[in-house]
């Protein structure tokens, strides 16, 4: 029995020493982390922004140009995505009737709500913009958005039927690829072009953001056309044509279309759209796609 008690006591003493060692290591690690953060110059706000992929636009003149480019209707509601510190929010409120500012980080949302409490034009919502319901009246969307959520936010906007305009700060390459940069056109842009015009605005240097991102940005604007270039009842057929062309079956756009349409009609469509027979599908402009559609569907 005495031997057993001695073993138990020795084990407990060892556990206590081990626990003190872990606590000391934790204190050392915490101190090292704080020192690392201090050396890197990162504040708590910087770390919070990195968690949510946020890079706030801090240059006032750039903010003002961005809001002017957004050109919100004075009488409409504007939904702002990623309000952050409110630099864009306040500029928007000068120009429109009501701004609903969405900020997913509750810390920043609470600070912005407190800072704008006296302005009846601004409503701050702490939550995910992508989960919000669409307004039942015409509205616009404006925002300096987290780059990682760009595709989801753009999809939300394209599916919002009462949305008049969308003006976003995105990665430069995303804006270029969606607006015919390098004379190439994406499937998404072509498929939505009859109803939505895509265009790129100002390029924004990465140095105007905090934290500083790895790449430059640009302003991307989507504007829903008052009168679609193709009747709404035919949009399904148009998108189906675009899907067929971009699948690449047959080795070329011409060959892909001949799998579904008479060869003579495809040839007539190419002549009317001024397309070479071996054209790469990405180099076909949205306008040429519409011409092809009209020829192939006998319009």
Curated annotation (Swiss-Prot):
PROSITE patterns: RRNA_A_DIMETH, SAM_RNA_A_N6_MT. GO terms for cellular component: cytosol. CDD domains: AdoMet_MTases. SUPFAM superfamilies: S-adenosyl-L-methionine-dependent methyltransferases. GO terms for molecular function: RNA binding; rRNA (adenine-N6,N6-)-dimethyltransferase activity. It comes from the Bacteria. The keyword S-adenosyl-L-methionine applies. GO terms for biological process: response to antibiotic. Keywords: Antibiotic resistance, Methyltransferase, Plasmid, RNA-binding, S-adenosyl-L-methionine, Transferase. Its EC number is 2.1.1.-. It is an enzyme of class 2 (transferase). Induction: By certain macrolide antibiotics. Probable RNA methylase. Confers resistance to carbomycin and several other macrolides, lincomycin and vernamycin B, but not to all macrolide-lincosamide-streptogramin B antibiotics. This is rRNA methyltransferase. It comes from Streptomyces thermotolerans.
């Amino acid at each position: 029995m005495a031997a057993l008690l001695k073993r138990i006591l020795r084990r407990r003493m060892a556990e206590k020493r081990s626990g003190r060692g872990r606590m000391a290591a934790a204190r050392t690690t915490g101190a090292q982390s704080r020192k690392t953060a201090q050396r890197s110059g990162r504040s708590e706000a910087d770390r919070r922004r990195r968690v949510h992929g946020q890079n706030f636009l801090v240059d006032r003149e750039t903010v003002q140009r961005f809001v002017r480019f957004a050109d919100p209707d004075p009488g409409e509601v504007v939904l702002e995505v990623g309000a952050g510190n409110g630099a864009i929010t306040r500029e928007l409120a000068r120009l429109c009737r009501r701004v609903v500012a969405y900020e997913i980080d509750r810390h920043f949302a609470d600070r912005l709500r407190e800072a704008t409490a006296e302005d009846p034009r601004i409503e701050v919502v702490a939550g995910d913009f992508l989960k919000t319901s669409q307004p039942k009246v015409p509205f616009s969307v404006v925002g300096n958005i987290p780059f990682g959520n760009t595709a989801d936010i753009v999809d939300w906007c394209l599916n919002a039927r009462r949305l008049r305009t969308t003006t976003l700060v995105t990665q430069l390459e995303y804006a270029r690829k969606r607006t015919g940069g390098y004379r190439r056109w994406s499937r998404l842009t072509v498929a939505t072009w009859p109803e939505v015009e895509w265009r790129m605005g100002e390029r924004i240097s990465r140095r105007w953001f905090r934290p500083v991102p790895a790449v430059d940005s640009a302003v991307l604007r989507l504007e829903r056309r008052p009168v679609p270039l193709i009747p709404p009842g035919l949009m399904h057929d148009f998108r189906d044509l675009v899907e067929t062309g971009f699948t690449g079956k047959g080795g070329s756009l011409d060959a892909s279309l001949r799998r579904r349409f008479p060869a003579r009609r495809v040839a007539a469509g190419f002549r009317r759209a001024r397309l070479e027979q071996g054209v790469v599908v990405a180099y076909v402009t949205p306008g040429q796609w519409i011409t092809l559609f009209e020829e192939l569907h006998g319009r």
